[in-house]
Regions:
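Single, function-defining residue in the core of a domain
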Residues: 1-65, 79, 84-91, 98-106, ...
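Short alpha-helical "recognition helix" segments of helix-turn-helix
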Residues: 69-75
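Primarily marks folded extracellular/lumenal domains of secretory and cell-surface proteins
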Residues: 110-116
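Extracellular beta-strand-rich solenoid/capping regions of secreted or surface-exposed proteins
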Residues: 146-148
Length: 368
């Protein structure tokens, strides 16, 4: 009997069945609690299971409920709402980050198995987009915030996005909302792997970080920051002209604070039409080998729209920035859970790409 019912849903609402199956498998309460026991440091379970907190927060993140307080009566949690908030405000950032990594690993396995990847941007390299996010200012619900007009910034994060898989591989959360993005790069550097290709905006054009990537046999394409020092080795050479702009390149030398030197390629795109920020040229630095065409390098950077689009989807489709939560750890946990939900959605999109290979699934399938 149940198989007939399931078959009807599979036929009439296949995506809904896929989402339900993924949620039941990847966010299964027993599995999540078992995972939590393996990663927790100072936290403990006591009255409220970690899986219950995940389920509660997902109701808010997925816009099923407007706030934690509204979701609480429907959560099945028997502990008081005060205990729930206490649990949320003490969640370790390593747990929030670890959950994103855990689900990303599961997503990568599934997407690879079904061959649902997007076409690679550059064969032989694992392209990773890096970008930052500052959570929006929160309401003044906490007593400590009621004496100030300014909204408190509950945190900041760096996100690593894989365009081939279409998922967030990692999130690096920070409780200091006013911290500079570059201050979080040391943690990101520990995750760099051989043949990675990190594509980044100028905020991440930091010599120590770029040299760390290079030292680990990985590569970078980064927009040059105005304060980044370099030594030209040859004049700019015109590579090509097009209707949108002219492409130039020159070899330059960069020197690390330690005195180490590397030769990189400086790519200049002179635009015929200014960007929305008024820029008439874009300057890139890369340590990719000479056999990689200059136009490909410019195209790699242009594809940063993929991570920008992912952030836009997170903001418009999910409640990723819970401005009702003044507790930094709680707000950052909500942000990380939004990426967990996004990655589950990415698996569904990958399955559709694998099934309908001759169709532009990313452009034609409605996300609602």
């Amino acid at each position: 009997m149940f198989s007939e019912i399931l078959e009807r849903f599979i036929k009439d609402s296949p995506v809904a069945v896929m989402v339900r199956a993924l949620l039941e498998n990847l966010l299964n309460a027993d599995k999540i609690d078992h995972w939590f026991e393996g990663v927790r440091q100072t936290q403990y379970t006591k009255e409220i299971l970690f899986s219950s907190i995940v389920g509660l927060m997902l109701q808010v993140v997925c816009k099923m409920r407007p706030s934690v307080h509204c979701a609480y009566p429907h959560s099945g949690i028997t502990a008081s709402v005060v205990a729930v908030y206490d649990k949320l405000k003490n969640l370790e950032l390593t747990t929030a980050q670890g959950l994103v990594r855990h689900i990303a690993g599961e997503a990568e396995t599934l997407i690879t198995h079904i061959a649902g990847m997007n076409p690679p941007l550059l064969a032989g390299y694992r392209v990773k987009f890096l970008d930052g996010n500052c959570l929006e200012a929160t309401d003044h619900r906490l007593k400590v915030l009621r004496g100030t007009r300014a909204g408190a910034l509950p945190g900041k994060s760096l996100v690593v996005f894989d365009p081939a898989l279409g998922i967030a591989l990692d999130v690096f959360p920070c409780e200091e909302g006013h911290a500079q993005e570059r201050s979080l790069l040391s943690a990101v550097a520990d995750t760099v792997q051989v043949a990675d290709l990190w594509v980044m905006d100028r905020n991440f054009c930091v010599l120590g970080w770029l040299f760390r990537i290079h030292q680990q046999a990985a590569f970078f394409v980064v927009r040059q920051h105005g304060n980044t020092p370099y030594k030209p080795l040859k004049p700019l050479e015109l590579i090509s002209k097009s209707a949108t702009g002219d492409l130039y390149e020159q070899p330059v030398e960069m020197t690390a604070p330690s005195g180490e030197k590397i030769q990189v390629r400086r790519v200049v795109v002179k635009l015929k039409k200014p960007t929305r920020n008024g820029d008439t040229f874009v300057v890139l630095l890369t340590d990719l080998p000479k056999e990689i065409d200059t136009l490909i390098i410019a195209e790699l950077y242009r594809n940063r729209w993929r991570i920008e689009t992912a952030f836009q989807k997170l903001e418009s489709r999910l409640n990723s920035e819970l401005n009702t939560l003044g507790y930094p750890r709680a707000a950052l946990f909500g942000f990380c859970l939004a990426w967990v939900a996004f990655n589950i959605y990415a698996i569904v999109m990958a399955a559709l790409r694998a099934t309908h290979r001759n169709q532009a699934i990313n452009e034609t399938v409605s996300e609602y």
